[in-house]
């Protein structure tokens, strides 16, 4: 599919996933049944926006991610929170990215396990951050920021599974 401003992408969440209260933060996504390695769990949906659309306030703040240079996926301003945004962060997540909108399992995920993703896989806004991470992972960074994708240990851990824009930056600049 050729991405262009205004296109609406329908979200998809595997029916083996449920959203419920999370010990990490607010609401989270949990496996109703186990998943094997490299299984598609979620395809983000939303509207494709330009930077101009964002500046004009057409996109809901907090729902936007860079999917190509100059193009963003997010919900329209005023839209209710969708279930595909109930995915909590972990510094050693059990999901990662297959492409700009598809999230897959890194390994086997057991029934009742919370599905998590490291926000460094797509977050590029230097002003964005989580002051206190509560993931509890041995790899916990303590704080999470919009430039964490530049950390060598994350580039090694998640090689090939960042958002394509970030993968391109890593290859071009050699962070």
List the predicted regions and their residue ranges.
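Catalytic cores of histone-lysine modification enzymes
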Residues: 2-98
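C-terminal SET catalytic tail plus cysteine-rich post-SET Zn-binding segment of SAM-dependent SET-domain
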Residues: 89-175
């Amino acid at each position: 599919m050729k991405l262009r401003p205004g296109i609406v992408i329908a979200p998809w969440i595997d029916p083996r996933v449920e959203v419920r209260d999370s010990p990490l933060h607010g609401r989270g996504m949990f496996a109703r049944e186990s998943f094997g390695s490299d299984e598609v769990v979620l395809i983000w949906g939303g509207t494709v926006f330009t930077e101009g659309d964002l500046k004009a306030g057409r996109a809901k703040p907090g729902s936007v991610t860079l999917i190509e240079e100059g193009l963003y996926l997010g919900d329209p301003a005023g839209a209710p929170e969708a279930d595909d945004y109930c995915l909590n962060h972990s510094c050693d997540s059990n999901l990662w990215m297959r492409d700009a909108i598809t999230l897959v399992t890194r390994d086997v995920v057991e029934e009742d396990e919370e599905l998590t993703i490291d926000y460094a896989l797509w977050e590029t806004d230097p002003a964005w951050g989580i002051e206190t991470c509560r993931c509890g992972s041995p790899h916990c960074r303590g704080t999470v920021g919009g430039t964490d994708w530049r950390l060598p240990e994350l580039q090694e851990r998640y090689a090939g599974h960042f958002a394509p824009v970030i993968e391109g930056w890593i290859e071009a600049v050699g962070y």
